[in-house]
């Protein structure tokens, strides 16, 4: 037995049509597409007010509601157009209407504000909406953000800072609003449109639909962020370009705006410059090593034996790798008077390494930062950003090799070993 479908009372339709449709200009009322936009406004009003205040009214989607309105006011379709065809054309037209909104970042630049639609299956996305006729893009963004969050971005918006994408032939532009405190109170101005408003860590949001980062860190499937996914990677790139270099400012913003070699969102939020944790901000690791190496080259080796040790160690490693083997001539052995103990010590060290093989974990724990003992006098090391850093006792170099840092060039020692 089929249950009879409850219809919207005629009195309710009369009120809604008088509020949203009958008062519009005649040239717009003759356009079925424009009428559909007004019907959409009436549908929202019906869900927000009538259904809450009048128990027993049927809950219906936009298509069923539009059919009821066109049936109640047949003069809205004077040519007798098919309602389904009109609704399909309206839906296609809506997909071509640009949408504008905002990406709101907190003061650390680590978190972003997302909104969730009212329906149970709605995902998380940025506050945005369709532009009205003859409305400026930044005005539309401010209006939509205020309607969905209750926060006015007019005083924060910059017309040149935005991410613009074309998704399914629909233009979407989101203005970037950094530096909003996390304790800001958000309160949607529209009813039954926004269910939740929350801050999310940018690092925990997915970059593509198969990115399982939110599943492991937030307990949410990546499809819950399908509306935000297209903007996450461009947002990270924008942050890296704009705030890539750390600064001493308290707000975490950079004054230089240069791009680091390997920027991370976590790095952008640091409020103070930490020299021991900087990851090559001005170029490649090779460039960083050259800058640290230059002041160390000024002091030569104390004797020739140290340089000979280094070269012999290199020859031994080349023999182990199967490369060209070099034989020590008798003359060379005679010149290396004090090298036998050092050679034996190297052999003992190699045996110890074989007995205690190096673990991969040790590479990360011990090679990340090496302590290089210096003389009693303070050495000034050239930092990556050109600022001298006083070094007394021990200095820490990020991701540098001990062999590189301890290398000292002695021309005379090399010439004697090569017998030139």
Curated annotation (Swiss-Prot):
Record domain Nudix hydrolase: where: 95-226
Positions of the UniProt region annotated as Disordered: 246-266, 313-344
Species this protein is from: Homo sapiens (Human)
Annotated gene: DCP2
Cofactor requirement: Mn(2+); Mg(2+)
InterPro entries, per database record: DCP2_BoxA, DCP2_BoxA_sf, Dcp2_NUDIX, NUDIX_hydrolase-like_dom_sf, NUDIX_hydrolase_CS, NUDIX_hydrolase_dom
Keywords: Cytoplasm, Hydrolase, Manganese, Metal-binding, Nonsense-mediated mRNA decay, Nucleus, Phosphoprotein, RNA-binding
Keyword Transcription annotated: no
Taxon lineage: Eukaryota, Metazoa, Chordata, Craniata, Vertebrata
EC class name: hydrolase
Subcellular location: Cytoplasm, P-body; Nucleus
GO molecular function: 5'-(N(7)-methylguanosine 5'-triphospho)-[mRNA] hydrolase activity; 5'-3' RNA exonuclease activity; manganese ion binding; RNA exonuclease activity, producing 5'-phosphomonoesters; telomerase RNA binding
Biased composition range(s): Low complexity: 249-259
Residue window of motif Nudix box: 129-150
EC annotation from Swiss-Prot or TrEMBL: 3.6.1.62
Role, per record: Decapping metalloenzyme that catalyzes the cleavage of the cap structure on mRNAs. Removes the 7-methyl guanine cap structure from mRNA molecules, yielding a 5'-phosphorylated mRNA fragment and 7m-GDP. Necessary for the degradation of mRNAs, both in normal mRNA turnover and in nonsense-mediated mRNA decay. Plays a role in replication-dependent histone mRNA degradation. Has higher activity towards mRNAs that lack a poly(A) tail. Has no activity towards a cap structure lacking an RNA moiety.
Pfam family, one: DCP2
Effect of residue 249 to D: Leads to reduced autophagosome formation under autophagy-inducing conditions
Protein name: m7GpppN-mRNA hydrolase
Residues binding Mn(2+): 144, 148
Phosphoserine sites (modified residues): 246-247, 249, 276, 284
Cofactor note: Mn(2+) ion is required for highest activity. Can also utilize magnesium ions.
Modifications the protein undergoes after translation, according to the UniProt entry: Phosphorylated at ser-249 in a MTOR-dependent manner.
SMART domains noted in UniProt: DCP2
Subunit structure: Found in a mRNA decay complex with LSM1, LSM3, LSM4, EXOSC2, EXOSC4, EXOSC10, PARN, XRN1, CNOT6, UPF1, UPF2 and UPF3B. Forms a complex with DCP1A, EDC3, DDX6 and EDC4/HEDLS, within this complex directly interacts with EDC4/HEDLS. Interacts with DPC1B. Interacts (via N-terminus and C-terminus) with TRIM21 (via N-terminus and C-terminus). Associates with polysomes. Interacts with LIMD1, WTIP and AJUBA. Interacts with DDX17 in an RNA-dependent manner. Interacts with ZC3HAV1. Interacts with APOBEC3G in an RNA-dependent manner. Interacts with ZFP36L1 (via N-terminus). Interacts with NBDY.
Gene3D superfamilies: Dcp2, box A domain, Nucleoside Triphosphate Pyrophosphohydrolase
Similarity annotation: Belongs to the Nudix hydrolase family. DCP2 subfamily.
Domain of life, source organism: Eukaryota
